[in-house]
Each structure stands twice: as structure tokens, then as C-alpha cells.
């Protein structure tokens, strides 16, 4: 499978901008969609990039490199202190929780507390707020981060379309913070030494639910030219984070039912936006991961 080695190449190519601009100019429905996207994104871009970035669920203070789980639940985080904040894994394999997922506007910036998360208990009268261990919060952490990454993806697209720097600044801040946080964090370790160790992902409890990848891949591709200039010293870190993610998705999972198909989409997406194998010392670039999906078995 041959791909263009230039960016953009994931959702569009070098001709896509002109075609999209023409569509927006000529079709009222396209103009309406585009304006609504701008309005939604401006709510955050106009606050400055740090507002949205600071709501990411990260180990802002401890910079934990190790996440420990017990079966299908989070247990604790620790390990050596990374040189930058690291990304939190979600609280449990199941979505079920008594607690209400807060809106982004209700989150405090740079929140990391040894007591866990401060959430409203939706099962009690008046929905009182409580400090709760992350293990009881289902997929709230992942849901928050995926929403933020989705906004950043939209900002990257808007920068590509308009050239407005506020969109690039927002997208780059979120992307850089989160991907650096993945790069410096390891795959979670199951203290029960059970089957869950073969399923767990970098952001979720199952490698088939690494939803963050769905936002990060197009974000990176739309923002590539900006990152290549503004974050040139971080490009190897971004590639390393993507490759760590893909490698873990290859290593984990189950050999039956539909897991292989669900894993393949993430691996293929990452392969499509990496550079050629020759660009990396380990020779694991776009061709390597695409070949793994098309011609090899994990």
C-alpha cells in the first residue's frame, strides 16, 4: 500500500483545502456546518490555549510513569517522576458509575488530587459532591480527555482551513501536552497478574477502545506543518508516543471475535500519519504498521 509521504494524507490531501473552500462558498449547508464548527471551537480558542489544556486529566503534579490496576479497576499511580505531566488512564473497564461526568466548564485547571476526583453523586438526593477514588468513576476520565482532544482536532482543521493562529495555538497546546504525557508513561500494570494485562490500553482498559487515537491522528495530520515548525524539537516524541500506542495495541487484545478488526483500525490510522520506516532508527514507521495490518498476524 503506497501513501503520499507528504501531509496532509489522512482525511484529505493537498487538494482538499481548495475543494472544501469551494464547497463552503457554493453550498449553504456546508457554510452552516463550517460556521457552527467555528462557533463551538471559538468558545475555547478565545480563552487562550491553556484554558482547555489545563482541563486534561493528567498527573499534573506527580508526573507518574506507572499506572497500576487490579483487574478491571484502577488502583494507583507512581513510579519515577517524568520530566513532564503524564496522561491518566481511565478508572475502570466498565462505564458504570454513580457519579456525574462534569462539564469542561466545571473542571478546575491542572486538577490532580490524592483523594481522587471531586464529583456529584447522581444516586443521592441533591447530587452532593464527594471525593472518590478513580476506580469508582467508570470511564469519566477517558470521556473528558476525548472531548478535549476532539475540540483540539477541530481547531487543527480550522487552522488548516483559515490560517488563524488562535486555532493552531489551541490545537498544539492540547496535542503537545497529551502526547508528551503518553510518551513518558508506561502501559498499565495489573497487580493481579491476570487476563486484564493482555487487554489494557494506554488510555483505556481495552485496546479496542483507545478512542483518543481517533482524535489525535487527524489532529496531527491537519496540524503537521505548524508542529514541524513550532515544535520541531518534539516531533520524535510525538512519533514515539504514537508508536508506543500502536505497539501496545498489537501486543494486547484477544485472538478471537471482532477484536482484531477493531484494533486494526487504530494501527492503520497511526501508520498512515507516521513517516517512512527509514525516518526512524528502529525502522518502524508507516510501512511497518500498515504491513502489520495487511500482511501479518499479532
Predicted feature residues:
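A compositional/structural signature marking long, glycine- and acidic/polar-rich segments
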Residues: 269-298
Amino acid at each position: 500500500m503506497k501513501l503520499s509521504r507528504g501531509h496532509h494524507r489522512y482525511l484529505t490531501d493537498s487538494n482538499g483545502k481548495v475543494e472544501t473552500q469551494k464547497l463552503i462558498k457554493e453550498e449553504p449547508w456546508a457554510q452552516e456546518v463550517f460556521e457552527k464548527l467555528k462557533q463551538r471551537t471559538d468558545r475555547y480558542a478565545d480563552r487562550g490555549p491553556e484554558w482547555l489544556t489545563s482541563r486534561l486529566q493528567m498527573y499534573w503534579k506527580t508526573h507518574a510513569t506507572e499506572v497500576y490496576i487490579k483487574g478491571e479497576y484502577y488502583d494507583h499511580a507512581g513510579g519515577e517522576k517524568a520530566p513532564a505531566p503524564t496522561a491518566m488512564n481511565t478508572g475502570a473497564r466498565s462505564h458504570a458509575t454513580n457519579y456525574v461526568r462534569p462539564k469542561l466548564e466545571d473542571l478546575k485547571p491542572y486538577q490532580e488530587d490524592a483523594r481522587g476526583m471531586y464529583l456529584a453523586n447522581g444516586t443521592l438526593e441533591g447530587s452532593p459532591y464527594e471525593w472518590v477514588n478513580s476506580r469508582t468513576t467508570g470511564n469519566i476520565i477517558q470521556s473528558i480527555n476525548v472531548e478535549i482532544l476532539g475540540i483540539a482536532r477541530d481547531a487543527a482543521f480550522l487552522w488548516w482551513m483559515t490560517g488563524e493562529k488562535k486555532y493552531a495555538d489551541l490545537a498544539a497546546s492540547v496535542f503537545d501536552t497529551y502526547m508528551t504525557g503518553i510518551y513518558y508513561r508506561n502501559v498499565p500494570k495489573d497487580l493481579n497478574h491476570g487476563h486484564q494485562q493482555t487487554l489494557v490500553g494506554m488510555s483505556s482498559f481495552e485496546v479496542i477502545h483507545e478512542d483518543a487515537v481517533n482524535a489525535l491522528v487527524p489532529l496531527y495530520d491537519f496540524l503537521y506543518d505548524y508542529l514541524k515548525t513550532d515544535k520541531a524539537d518534539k516531533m520524535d516524541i510525538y512519533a514515539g508516543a504514537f508508536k508506543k500506542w500502536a505497539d501496545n495495541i498489537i501486543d494486547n487484545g484477544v485472538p478471537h471475535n471482532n477484536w482484531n478488526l477493531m484494533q486494526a483500525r487504530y494501527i492503520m490510522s497511526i501508520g498512515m500519519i507516521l513517516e517512512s520506516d527509514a525516518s526512524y532508527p528502529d525502522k518502524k514507521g508507516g510501512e511497518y504498521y500498515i504491513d502489520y495490518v495487511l500482511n501479518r498476524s499479532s
